[in-house]
Amino acid sequence: MAENGLPCLDLLEATPGILRGLITELTGEDARWKPAPERFSVAEVLAHLSHSEGHCYRMRLDRFMAETRPEFEPDDAQMYLDLYRGVDPDEAFDQFEDQRETNIEFLRGLPDNAANRVALHREFGEITLAQMLNEWALHDLGHIRQVAELVRARKYQAGAGPMAASYHLKP
């Protein structure tokens, strides 16, 4: 927990480095590979993370701090799928990393009582900033897992030869 009482900041701060480690050996072709037409590629996951960082989480952070009981609409990631297609994975990652660094700096500068700020989410009801930060960490970890599975399937499964049969990948 951060000095100001906000949860999850260390994990949120670590996410870009974890992702960088996972994608470091991917080519552009690897990053654009999709296990199925309806599934995301690594590049699309990175674009989604970048978009969510600025257009969901940061906007909500600002409203948590500027308004009394702001009302939030549910976020519909499916609505933005077209934005993610054809993105440059390096650009998407760099944008995500820059935005995350800015957001962490902002979060670390919030006052001690910020965790208890309340908003009204139209789907989930009353939520606190601390709860949103925990959801943000859940979101990060889900996409870290997703990227890891995509990298495993694209980059390493074939090279494992017959031993790959003992792994049940779900990219």
Predicted regions and their residues:
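Short, contiguous alpha-helical
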Residues: 32-75, 118-171
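A short, mixed-charge helix-start or loop-turn motif at secondary-structure junctions
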Residues: 1-5, 82-89, 122-129
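Alpha-helical bundle segments that constitute or directly flank the non-heme di-iron/ferroxidase center
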Residues: 1-29, 52-63
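Amphipathic, non-membrane alpha-helical segments in soluble helical-bundle scaffolds
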Residues: 5-13, 39, 43, 89-93, ...
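Amphipathic, soluble alpha-helical interaction motifs
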Residues: 18-25, 29, 60, 106-113, ...
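Solvent-exposed interaction patches of small proteins and small membrane subunits
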Residues: 3, 7-10, 34, 66, ...
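Non-transmembrane alpha-helical segments in soluble domains
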Residues: 9, 20-23, 43-46, 50, ...
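Acidic/histidine-rich alpha-helical segments that form the ligand environment
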Residues: 15, 78-117, 131-136, 144-146
